[in-house]
Each structure stands twice: as C-alpha cells, then as structure tokens.
Amino acid sequence: PSWGGKVTKPPRGKLFYIPQRPYMTLGSLRDQIIYPHTFEEMKRRGKTDADLFKYLDIVQLRLLVQQREKGLDSIEDWIDVLSGGEKQRIAMARLFYHHPQFAILDECTSAVSVDVEGSMYEYCRQVGITLFTVSHRKSLWSHHEYVFRFDGRGGSEFIIIEGTSDEFGS
C-alpha cells in the first residue's frame, strides 16, 4: 500500500483473470465456456446448459450455438473459427460461469462493441463480481467507481470517479 494498510491475495477460486487474447481449448463450444472445468465438474457445481445459454445471451452469442448442428457439443478449432471479439465474449461468458468474487480484465473487451461491453460489465455489477480493469477505452469508466492511473514515469494517482468520466482519456 502507498500509505498504509494490508495487502492480501484472495483465496484460490475467488480471483479470475481474462487477457486480451483469451485461451481457447481443444474441444466443444461448452468446453470453451466452462474451461478449465470438465462437463462432469460443471454438473457437480449444479450448472446446466440453460445457465450457459443465459451467459451466451448476455454476451450476445446465442446465434453461434444455433448455427451449429450439434449446438454446445460442436467441436471446432475455435481459435481459428471465432473472431477476436467472439473470443473475448466467450471469455466473458467463462467469467460468468465461474462467478468469482474478483476479476482482472486486461483489455479483454478491446474487440467488442461498446453496447455489448456495457451489457457484460453491467451483469458483473448485478451479480457482485468486483472488477479490476486494465483498459484505454473511455467507455469503461462509467462501469467503475475508482481509477488508479499510472503516468508512465513511475508515478500514479488514485481517483474517485464522480459524475461523468470524460476526463479519464480515451
């Protein structure tokens, strides 16, 4: 801490990280959403395909499933099949599935439209996922309460966001 206090790391399973280029595993579309869990782990957690469809609706990718004969069981080379924005939206559906207490989002919506991005961030707020976002997009400031800005010369400042967020760069 800069001026005092105690820094603690959340317990395993309470923190989730999504990079700008999310990992796509070999396997079904379902496997992409529940990664690194298996289908058996998904069932043990009490999750169903209906839950996955809910997450796909939030990230506006239900059509991706409907376009495939085998639906969630479709197996493709997802790293090549999905666009950059679709991969980022699958990663957000993955976040919703795992439902951690905290999430670090590292430019993870850079290829997603502002309206879909807003829906995803709003859902995180609704379900109580605390977000730490690394981004240059001005559109994201409205989804946060604080900014920790680095100046590129070793300095930083902690800012409470009040009202509009136009002052925080693009």
Positions of predicted regions on the chain:
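Conserved catalytic loops of ABC-family nucleotide-binding domains
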Residues: Y123-H143
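Conserved coupling/switch loop of ABC ATPases
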Residues: Q20-R21, T25-G27, D57, L64, ...
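ABC-fold ATPase nucleotide-binding domain signature/coupling loops
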Residues: T25, K43-K47, L52-I90, F96-Q101, ...
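Conserved post-Walker A segment of ABC ATPase nucleotide-binding domains
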Residues: P1-K54, G118-G128
